[in-house]
Regions:
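Generic ordered-secondary-structure signal
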Residues: 20-25, 30-31, 49, 103-105, ...
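N-terminal capping segments
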Residues: 1-83
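Sequence-level detector for tyrosine residue identity
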Residues: 36-37, 50, 64-66, 113, ...
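...with weaker cross-activation on analogous glycine-rich loops/strands in unrelated enzymes
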Residues: 64-153
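Low-complexity, compositionally biased segments
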Residues: 16, 27, 34, 48, ...
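Active-site or metal-binding loop neighborhoods of secreted/extracellular toxin and effector enzymes
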Residues: 4, 14, 127, 133-182
């Protein structure tokens, strides 16, 4: 299969519908609200892990941890990083995609081909974005749910609010996939 070609089957549509439902349910849970907005230092970790476990699968679930932000500069921040979550697909080898721009860190990882979970964090800001993304033939990627600073969810296909944070990395990572540079 050519890396610039996506195969669309009924099971992919069903998977997307399930992700949308799960993410909406997750945002309604007080447990998630408490983890995400709590003063506990691990709130960033717990919220992201909660979403990943709910939206993921037995073969590709995520565990987040804190790590030193740009260690060579001695800076610390709330950074979400994946640990042993990459899933191999026949067409594309899904590896963790990490990018650091100035004081921001981003990554995407497979929840199960072709669905990605992308995260974004800013140094010195205890909040971040987590987004479930799913490619579409029209736009190459689709934001299924975006959990951000105000706990807002974007409607499926709402690419107008897909410009920052996890959305930026999603576009970047899919660009690499489609151009064969990954």
């Amino acid at each position: 299969m050519n890396k610039s070609t996506w195969i669309w089957e009924e099971r992919h549509d069903k998977a997307r519908e399930k992700l949308i439902k799960v993410c909406h349910e997750a945002l309604e849970k007080k447990d998630f609200q408490r983890h995400y907005y709590g003063k506990n230092k691990t709130h960033c970790n717990r919220a992201s892990e909660y979403i990943a476990k709910q939206c993921g699968s037995n073969t590709a679930w995520m565990h987040y941890k804190y790590w030193k932000w740009l260690k060579r500069k001695g800076k610390l921040g709330c950074v979400m990083t994946a640990n042993s979550i990459c899933r191999r697909a026949p067409e594309i080898v899904g590896e963790e995609i990490t990018r650091v721009d100035q004081n921001q860190a981003h990554f995407c990882a497979w929840l199960g081909y072709p669905v990605l979970l992308c995260a974004h964090a800013i140094k010195g800001n205890r909040s971040g974005h987590v987004a479930i993304v799913y490619p579409t033939p029209q736009s190459s990627f689709l934001q299924v749910c975006n959990i951000g600073w105000n706990n807002r969810i974007c409607s499926p296909g709402d690419n107008k609010s897909f410009g920052g944070g996890a959305g930026y990395l999603s576009a970047w990572s899919f660009y690499l996939l489609k151009t064969g540079d990954l």
